[in-house]
Amino acid sequence: MEELQGYLEIDRSRQQHFLYPLLFQEYIYALAHDHGLNGSIFYEPMENLGYDNKSSSLIVKRLITRMHQQNHLIISVNDSNENGFVGRNKSFYSQMVSEGFAVIMEIPFSLRLVSSLEEKEIAKYHNLRSIHSIFPFFEDKLSHLNHVSDILIPHPIHLEILVQTLHCWIQDAPSLHLLRFFLHEYRNSNSLITPKKSISLLKKENQRFFLFLYNSHVYECESVLVFLRKQSSHLRSTSSGTFLERTHFYGKIEHLVVVLRNDFQKTLWLFKDPFMHYVRYQGKYILASKGTHLLMKKWKSHLVNFWQCHFYLWSRPDRIHINQLYNHSFYFLGYLSSVRLNTSVVGIQMLENSFLIDTSINKFETLVPIISLIGSVVKAKFCNVSGHPISKSVRADSSDSDIINRFGQIYRNLSHYHSGSSKKQTLYRIKYILRLSCARTLARKHKSTVRAFLKRLGSEFLEEFLTEEEQVLSLIFQRNSFPSYRSHRERIWYLDIIRINDLANHS
């Protein structure tokens, strides 16, 4: 218990007390209006956000002047219509302040991480928390495990829970009051961390603010798992304290012992199974084990009790299913993953005797659900609900090459993201939809037919829809030494998958 108490001890010297004045600095809004967080796999235009037209140094200065002239910035929501700051341009100015506020609130987290990097060696631990650790887990570990449980991170029942979570990190009272103001202004922010919603479905003009709140909530829910993983003999680490400094956390652990009517050290042995694995992507995580079904049930029970008693998070146990890997498929990272038992017969010749031996090998498979992928293409208006390609409206001054490049880049992005699929037939259907949608768009622009347009462009049009690996392999390998079908059956995981992807968020 002394080790746990020291492990969770708060470093008061790193708490940030003077964040609120940064709202009056122009460079904060310059950082906030960086469009990097708003990237989309379909390259949706940013004009609808209003940044390109309105976001300028003059408007930022005007905003700061209004905040200086205001007697009190933090006001009740009921009086917001009478206030000059959030009156006529309430939506736009509130958007600017909320995104600038998100940048400011990220500062304490960044400073603590940099400090930990300077003081400790966290290379191994950092890799464990990276999305890149998911790929080797799928390829090397999952096929050897027995049980899996895919769980949605529970969401808070009250907005004040989010404020209290950040209060453990930030002691700046005005910043916390401003946070309450924004949470009550955007009352629909509860959908931010509702399991059935994804971050990409949130209001785009407040995406950075919501992303910050979401990540803070995820770290809070994940904290107990990080600690238990550190205690495991298989995944020891010296840097978990970076993300585990929580007010009264030691008291919560003590209370957990009382609730479960068990000594904490006796309870901890349940989590020391070296075959228990944990991976997470956004709002969903997986617990997998080579152990028994009873071990998985104990993990489930402890996590549900811990979240409900100490984080006031409601998680329905009946929605946490424990399944055997060999007869269950789970949806994760945009793939429908499963472990299949492949049997084969091997013939052995020994002198005059011959034998036939049956061998069984667990094989990990990943499939791209065609319904989810087609649904995203329908949402982007490249085809109708039946999957038939349709033309898109384009600007009159757009050149043919720009239109073709845009359609080709969209397909390459989708193919790049889903290159880890065991079977590529779904991607061929998407290529057909995008290619024909592009042809219909160009034919509509030139007031021609699709057939005539394709005949005029010829093979140059088809080459725009080749993926990078298809182009490279066609140049490096001879057809007889590297059959084309082989490249379509091999899984390729790209480590630059860092953008938020709509297809990976829905089950």
UniProtKB/Swiss-Prot annotation:
Keyword field: Chloroplast, mRNA processing, Plastid, RNA-binding, tRNA processing
GO CC annotation terms, alphabetical: chloroplast
MF term (GO), any: RNA binding
Domain of life the protein comes from: Eukaryota
Entry keyword Calcium: no
One GO BP annotation of this record: mRNA processing
Subcellular location: Plastid, Chloroplast
Role this protein plays: Usually encoded in the trnK tRNA gene intron. Probably assists in splicing its own and other chloroplast group II introns.
HAMAP family attached to this UniProt entry: MatK
Family: Belongs to the intron maturase 2 family. MatK subfamily.
Name this protein carries in UniProt: Maturase K
Annotated organism of origin: Liriodendron chinense (Chinese tulip tree)
